[in-house]
Amino acid sequence: IFPRPVLQPPKMRPLTEEETKTFFEKLSKYIGKNITYLVERSDEPHVFRLHHDRVYYVSERVLKKAECVPRDNLSALGVCFGKFTKSGKFRLHITSLDYLSQYCRFKVWIKPTAEMSFMYGNHVLKAHVAKISEEAPEHEGVVVFSQTSDLPIGFAVTAKSAAASAKLDPTAIVAFHQADVGEYLRNE
């Protein structure tokens, strides 16, 4: 009988070059060159760290304080931006919405009657759109805002460019749902 290998729990570590490339490609679909504002902050330096296939955005000060926590006891640290799937793709989580909305390039505002539909996981239809960023291209990330409160409620990927979506019929999909604030309740 062979002894069983003792598996060490994964510790929080910097992203590899390939992981960084995949992560930044996905993030740039939503915030473009504004990634530099996340990486090169003037107020307090922040870093991206990988832990249990999830990417966290954490300040270096908090990271140094967390070094004394045993890795068995560390479940999360900072803001979770998303996770890597088993196939190696990166999927953004709703927890990154505050940063995406702050630095996003393209926005979609939806009508109050469509907010619940979007928050139940449905795509954004032409009839739901109150306003869209004029220069939004096809298959690009957008942050979805409420028209009444101007608060971010999720993010999506455009199905057509803003110019092309103006000519669509009311039942056509303008943006494909990716994540919304209703996930907090649905996933619990």
Where do the protein language model's features map onto the residues?
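Accessory RNA 3′-end/elbow-binding domains used by RNA modification enzymes
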Residues: F2-E188
